[in-house]
From Swiss-Prot:
The N-terminus is blocked. This protein has three functional calcium-binding sites. Gene3D superfamilies: EF-hand. SMART domains: EFh. The lineage of its organism: Eukaryota, Fungi, Dikarya, Ascomycota, Saccharomycotina. The modification Phosphoserine is found at residues 82, 102. Component of the SPC110 complex containing at least CMD1, SPC29, SPC42 and SCP110. Interacts with SPC110. It comes from the Eukaryota. Calmodulin mediates the control of a large number of enzymes, ion channels and other proteins by Ca(2+). Among the enzymes to be stimulated by the calmodulin-Ca(2+) complex are a number of protein kinases and phosphatases. Component of the spindle pole body (SPB) required for the proper execution of spindle pole body (SPB) duplication. It holds the Pfam family EF-hand_7. One of its GO terms (biological process) is regulation of microtubule nucleation. Ca(2+) 3 binds at residues 94, 96, 98, 105. This is Calmodulin. The keyword Metal-binding applies.
Length: 147
């Protein structure tokens, strides 16, 4: 699972992990997960940490082994890369370069990335994130798709 990580990244993660592995038993408590992630530049919410914990604590011991942590970080970095790719795609479809996508542009973007959404679904998405202008900015779009 961690095959997309460089040796440098693995070493950085191991160092951060070791700082919180106080008794050197190869694991950290679930309550320390958020602190470790923040030390690596991520900013997970409490709910996200709980969700992640439920997913990665595969043996259910409320401890996170380094292998579980590496799998998590690999996935988190991949997610961040996907968000960056999404932002780049957004910019491509922002025809006039004003940082906004209209409903028509959004429909085109969603069709281009393989989504098969109806007009009503796109309208619902716009209503959820728009300030009422019928357009959304890059940050609103990324936030919408990361929910």
């Amino acid at each position: 699972m961690s095959s997309n990580l460089t040796e440098e990244q693995i070493a950085e993660f191991k160092e951060a992990f070791a700082l919180f592995d106080k008794d050197n038993n190869g694991s950290i408590s679930s309550s320390e997960l958020a602190t470790v992630m923040r030390s690596l530049g991520l900013s997970p919410s409490e709910a996200e940490v709980n969700d992640l914990m439920n997913e990665i604590d595969v043996d259910g011991n409320h401890q996170i082994e380094f292998s579980e942590f590496l799998a998590l970080m690999s996935r988190q970095l991949k997610s961040n890369d996907s968000e960056q790719e999404l932002l780049e795609a957004f910019k491509v479809f922002d025809k006039n370069g004003d940082g906004l996508i209209s409903a028509a542009e959004l429909k085109h973007v969603l069709t281009s990335i393989g989504e098969k959404l109806t007009d009503a679904e796109v309208d619902d998405m716009l209503r959820e994130v728009s300030d009422g202008s019928g357009e959304i900015n890059i940050q609103q779009f990324a936030a919408l798709l990361s929910k």
